[in-house]
């Protein structure tokens, strides 16, 4: 099974936005693992489909869907596409894993995946991520110095 995490560029209110809908690719559809979707969704404290509309125009998992279909063709495993919002609305000064509701959800989700692995299922976590967008092209008026690059890299690695 594949858990695909992508950036939710529109940053909906939900920290993670799941969808049970398949992703269409030129190589065929990426099917959702419905029992796993239900197990993951049941561990969240909110409706994970509340912001499902974010999947419609989001590009952060499109390449991953095509890549998975290309690699495995007819044997492509089912997946769970999850868009990840900004966590700053929950806390601007703490790591997301230290926010109580997020910490509990991460532990619960980890337990669901561990249970699947204990049943002999292979688990792949695939990230479609963006790193820092800095510079004039992104509206910044600052000079990109080696010191700033090191700081940005450090922030990207958190």
Language-model-derived ranges and their functions:
Residues 1-158:
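Active-site histidine-anchored catalytic micro-motif
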């Amino acid at each position: 099974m594949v858990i695909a995490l992508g950036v939710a560029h529109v940053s909906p209110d939900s920290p993670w936005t799941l969808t049970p809908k398949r992703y269409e690719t030129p190589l065929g559809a990426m099917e959702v693992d419905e029992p796993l979707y239900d197990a993951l969704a049941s561990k969240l404290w909110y409706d994970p489909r509340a912001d499902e509309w974010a999947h419609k125009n989001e590009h952060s998992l499109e390449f991953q869907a095509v890549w998975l279909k290309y690699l495995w063709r007819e044997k492509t495993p089912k997946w769970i596409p999850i868009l990840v919002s900004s966590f700053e609305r929950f806390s601007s000064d703490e790591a997301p894993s230290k926010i109580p509701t997020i910490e509990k959800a991460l532990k619960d989700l980890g337990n669901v995946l561990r249970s699947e692995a204990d049943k002999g299922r292979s688990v792949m976590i695939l990230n479609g991520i963006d790193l820092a967008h800095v510079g004039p092209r992104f509206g910044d008026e600052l000079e990109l110095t080696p010191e700033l690059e090191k700081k940005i890299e450090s922030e990207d690695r958190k």
